[in-house]
Amino acid sequence: MAQNLLECYKNKLAVSEGYYSKTHNGEKLSMNKKMVVARLLENTNKYMTEAFNNSVGTQRSDMGSYKRFALNLVTVAVPSLIAFDLVMVQPMSSMSGYVNYIEYVAGTNKGATAQGDVFNSPFALGDFDKDGNVKTTDADYTAARVVEVLTDDLTLSWTPVARIVKVDNVALTKEQAANITVDENGKITDGNDTQIIKAGAKVAYIYDNVVIPQNDLPILNAKMSMIPVVAKARRIAIYYSQIAAFQAKNDYGFDLGDQLAEQAVGRLAYEIDTEIVDTLVTNAAEDSELVWSKSLPHGVSKQEHYAGFVEVLEMAAAKLYQRTKKFAPNYLLIAADIKPILAFVPGFQAATVNNMNGPYMAGTLNGLKVYVSPNMEAKTFVLGVNGNDMMTSAAAYCPYMPVVPTQLLGYADGAMSQGFSTMYDIVVLNKALLIAGRVTA
C-alpha cells in the first residue's frame, strides 16, 4: 500500500520535495515525510472524487481543473510547514480518535512503589513529576528488602518477616534487634526501653520471599492509556470584484484571484506553524540554571563573550539527556532578538531563507536546527527532541483535512468568492522532551 501511494503520487512528491528544500535549507524529504504527503494527497483525492460523484451542479466541466488545483495546494502547502522538523506528523483517518499506548505499572503497594506507579512507557523508563523529571521507582520492588512507613497499628505489610534492618535509616544493634519481635501477621512488639518502633517510623526489613504460600507478590500490570485527538477547523475566504480582477490583469499583469488564494493559504500555514511553536514553548518547563547574561564583562570582547552562549545550550542538552536517560535535543527555538547573538557563535551556519512566513529555519548550530519565531517572548529559547515517532516527539501535528478549497463562485454583480479550510489537531505527547532557558540583558 505504501509503495503504491508513493508510485501514484511520485510526480507531485517531486514538486513537494522542491518546496520542502526551499524552506528547509536544501534538505530532502525523508521516506516517512513522503508517506505523510502521499497520504494527505490520497485523502484529498478520495474526498474530491466522492464530492464530484455526488454533485448535481451545472459546472461539471470545471471539476477536473478544480480537483487538480486542490491537489496542487496540498502538494505545495504541506511541505512548506515547519511541522516536520519540530513534531511528529500523523494524518488522521477520521475527525476524532485516540493515540493509544501501553504503560507498564505496579499492581501492588510495596515499599516506595505505589500501585499504579509507571515502570515503563513509550516515553521513558518511569513516570514524570511536575517538573518533567523522571521519578525513580523502588529498585527493590521484586526483592526481599522492603522499606515502608509504619501506620498506627505497627504492622508490616510483607510477611513472614525475617528481620528488621533499619529504623529511620539507622541500623539496629544486636541488642535492639533481639528485643523486637514480629508475629506471623507482621505485628511488631518492641521490648526496648526507648521504644524504637513508633507510628510514622521508616522501617527497612527483610521478608521471606521464598517460602510458599506467599501472602502477596509484586505484580506488574499492563495499562492501556490514550490521548484524545479531535480535529479542529481553520477557515478563510477570499472575496474580490470581477472588475478589480480585470484591471489587475490588464493594467498590472497579475491574476488577483491567484494572488488572494496564495495569501489565504499562506495565512493558514502561518497560523499552523505558529500554533505548533506556541504549543512547544508553552509546555517547555523553564530551568532556573539555564540563564545567560548578554552583558559584556570588563575586558572581554563581544565575539568572545557571545561565543559562551553555546555553554548554556550544552547544559540544556545535558539536562534533557539526564532527564530522559536516552534522548538529546535536535532543534532550538529562539525569540527574534536572540538571533543576532548566534552570528558571533562559532559553529552557527546560517540558512538561505527564500520564503519567510512566520516561524522560519534560520540555520544550524552544532547539529541543532535553529528556528526563529516572532511570537516567542523576548530573550527566551527552547530546546526539544523530534524523531517523528511517539517515543521521540514532544508533540504531534495530526492533519485530518489538508488545505481544501471550494470552487470559485461568481455572482451576477461581479463578486467572486472562494473558501479555504483545513482541519487538524495538535497534541502534546511528552513534555519531558522540552526544556526552556532565558537570556538576560
Predicted segment positions?
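Extended assembly-interface regions of large multimeric machines
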Residues: 1-150, 155-157
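Beta-sheet entry/capping signal
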Residues: 63-67, 95-101, 235-237, 328-332, ...
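Active-site-proximal structural scaffolding
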Residues: 95, 165, 213, 231, ...
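Sequence/fold signature of self-assembling virion shell proteins
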Residues: 85, 124, 208-210, 221-265, ...
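Short, glycine/acidic-rich hinge or "gate" loops at secondary-structure transitions
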Residues: 91, 257, 272-294
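Glycine- and aromatic-enriched membrane alpha-helices
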Residues: 9-10, 57, 188, 213-215, ...
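Acidic/polar, low-complexity extended loops/arms that serve as protein-protein interfaces
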Residues: 74-81, 94-134, 138, 142, ...
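Extended, solvent-exposed, turn-rich assembly/linker loops in the middle of proteins
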Residues: 289-356
